[in-house]
Amino acid sequence: MRFLKSFLVFSIVMLLISGCKSAQNSSTKQAITSPDTSLQETASSTAPAANELSPSISPTPRVQKTPSSSPKPKNAKWIYNRKTHVLTIKGTEEMYAEQTEDWIDNERKFDEHNGIQLNFNERKVKEIVVKPGITVINKGAFAAFRNVKKITLPNTIKKINDYAFYNCQSLQELTIPDKVVSVGKECFFYCRQLRSIHIGKNLRTIGNGSFAGCKNLQSIELSSENKYLETKYGGLYQKKQKCLYFQYQHTKTAEIAPDTKCIGTFAFTYNTPLKEVTIPDSVRRIKGGAFCYCRNLECVHLSNHSKLYKIDSPYGEMGMYPDDLWYSGSFLHCKKLKELHLPNSLKAIDWDTFSGCKSLTLYLGSQFTNFRKSQIAGVSAIQVSPHNKKFSSKDGVLYDRHKKTLLNYPEYKTDQTFVVPKSVRHIQESAFRANEHIENVFFPKKLKHIGEGAFNGCKKLKNATIPGKQTKIGRSAFLFCRHVVIHAPKHSEAAKFAKKHDRMFEVFRKK
């Protein structure tokens, strides 16, 4: 009897435990499957018609890690008419981009999870009409709508965020309403068919590179009541800071307003016709990317009376898509730029300012004091003012004042053979880096050290003659120099280096 009672108690306990586990498993399964179910229910109950995209299941951009991190649309409906190819936006407050996590060749693909077809393709849209009530055009809202020719914005719009019309390649004209106070960065980037734009009376600030790549923009019509901006000399200027936002008139010779203090980010970018520009003495700052990709620019005039004190570092990432991230120095890839005389007021420049300027001879002023290899990368020759107390030059090569250290052998210097001056005791790190012309280099006998990466990427280098027995060599000095032969005395430091790092070696014999 006692055994029977114990068995009954044990059975009841096991049944309870089994029930709890089954309940837990069912709830777990429900939790796992509930998103699909709820999505299907949403699709069936609130499925958009053939000409409507429901914001309740709007995808989110890849630039945001998870869908939950994207702000939810507030009372905004996207209605697409297949017959007229007109997309109409209705609602109130902020309007957010209808985007998924998938970006392929700047084309957004809309959500088809669980067999749901959203019946919308931005490539087909030819006109966008935003109805009154919407107050903000949010980040990337119409980015890459490549066939849109016309966009109508209501007077209720107060703000246009970053990349809003990015890469709308067919857009021809646009009016920014009077209530808009700010336009985000790269808002109209690469709208290459944009010919005219009207700016309302309250627009105060325009983000970096908003009009970069708008190579057909011929006119910017500014409201006569706008107190913050002005158009003159073929450019759009910020009044208070006297900054050139964008030079919209693309001519062979550019004229900048004489009272300008700043040349803005991407102000002249992709200005293909530009061959010559004179920078007024009043300009104190040139921002990153200001003249990048001006492929026909040959001459930039800067006088010795210039007040220029800063050429900014590259602007940094450009573009809202992960594949579009790139960097742009102020004169990046100005391949035809022949010479540039930096004024005495300029003490330093930032990295990669002149990258890709294959024809450039760069003249450093008397007050230039700050140097790193990356700052002057991409030029063909460097000349230094004889009054400079820190640097000197010879045959287009940069040295310290007393020519004890070779600092920079220009990337695009075309000589095949180079003899290092006898006074040189040190070769700076990365001094010859990426020069693809040099084949033979002869070092002086009293050279003490060749720095790390000194000849990194010098692919045509064949012979390095090092006559000194005590010349030490950095481990990566000849990185990616696959065909170089080191010529040095037997049992010298250079011979030891060659043996240790498996470099081709020949015993140097004085002729």
Q: Across the structure, where does each feature detected by a protein language model lie?
A:
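Positively charged n-region of N-terminal signal peptides that target proteins for export
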Residues: 1-6
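Alpha-helical transmembrane segments
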Residues: 10-14
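C-terminal motif of bacterial Sec signal peptides marking the signal peptidase cleavage site
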Residues: 16-19
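Bacterial signal peptide processing site
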Residues: 21-23
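Ser/Thr-rich, Proline-interspersed low-complexity disordered segments
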Residues: 32-36, 42-48, 52-70
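Surface-exposed repetitive/solenoidal architectures
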Residues: 67-147, 164-166, 189, 267-269, ...
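Structural signature of tandem-repeat unit edges
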Residues: 84-92, 122-136, 146-159, 169-182, ...
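Consensus positions within tandem repeat domains that build extended binding/scaffold surfaces
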Residues: 138-141, 161-164, 184-187, 208-210, ...
